[in-house]
């Protein structure tokens, strides 16, 4: 696995910095994942600061130079869009992808279906290439577009540890979520991977997931 190479390249040095790593943190995940990140980073001796934002605003911060040092929770493949980032080891949680149909509740929909996605939901970019996707600013706008017949489906994402959404929302799939950091933070990445490996081997990683993320 590529992240093991980082351990070999950088070593296993304990890291502590006066300046905390700034992590873009989608507001849907902040309260749930903060304790998990606190335990992980704390054991590695790394300070951090969460920057709450919408999914779309978080991506703007990632694109801006020196605005943040990474993203707290994104699905696999986020580094393909932002190659200066590195996926840090094993998944930390899961997100559920929900869809609300206008008429036909069958998923996947037929070709030509117009799908509305809230801005910043990477899953739509990766898996809906065969459909016409309309990007929406928020759920309120999305529901309005759905009810007016401007879109056939509305897609949203939320932590899988939260209660399932009621009908007419349908759970389409679940995706694993990872921490992503700027590759330039080599020492911090190595320290986090070292701690993660220890936590996985001694069962602490799973225990943290069960403690903080009850659905996993």
Stretch-by-stretch model annotation:
Residues 3-12:
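Sec-dependent N-terminal signal peptides
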Residues 12-18:
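Sec/Tat signal peptide C-region and signal peptidase I cleavage site
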Residues 21-39, 101-136, 142-144, 148, ...:
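Bilobed "Venus flytrap"/periplasmic-binding protein-like clamshell domains
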Residues 39-43, 103-106, 110-113, 117-119, ...:
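Extended ligand-binding regions for polar small-molecule ligands
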Residues 46, 63-73, 147-156:
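Alpha-to-beta junction loops
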Residues 49-61, 134-144:
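Short helix-initiation/N-cap motifs at beta->coil->alpha
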Residues 51-112, 119-123, 160-172:
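Acidic, polar ligand-binding/catalytic clefts
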Residues 91-98, 163-197, 201:
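Periplasmic-binding protein-like
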């Amino acid at each position: 696995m590529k992240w093991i190479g980082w351990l070999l390249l950088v070593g296993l040095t304990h890291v502590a910095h006066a300046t905390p790593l700034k992590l873009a943190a989608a507001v849907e995940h902040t309260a749930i994942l903060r304790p998990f990140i606190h335990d992980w980073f704390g054991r590695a001796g790394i300070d951090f600061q969460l920057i709450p934002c919408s999914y779309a605003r978080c991506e703007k911060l990632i694109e801006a130079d020196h605005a943040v040092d990474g993203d707290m929770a994104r699905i696999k493949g986020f580094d393909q869009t932002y190659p200066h980032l590195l996926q840090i080891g094993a998944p930390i949680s899961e997100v559920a992808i929900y869809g609300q149909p206008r008429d036909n509740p069958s998923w996947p929909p037929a070709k030509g279906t117009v799908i509305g996605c809230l801005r910043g939901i990477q899953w739509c970019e990766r898996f809906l290439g065969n459909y016409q996707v309309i990007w929406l600013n928020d759920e309120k706008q999305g529901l309005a577009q759905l009810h007016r017949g401007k879109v056939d489906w509305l897609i949203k994402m939320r932590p899988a540890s939260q209660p399932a959404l009621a009908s007419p929302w349908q759970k389409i799939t679940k995706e694993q979520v990872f921490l992503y950091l700027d590759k330039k933070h080599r020492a911090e990445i190595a320290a986090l991977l070292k701690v993660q490996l220890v936590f996985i081997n001694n069962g602490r990683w799973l225990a943290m997931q069960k403690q903080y993320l009850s659905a996993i």
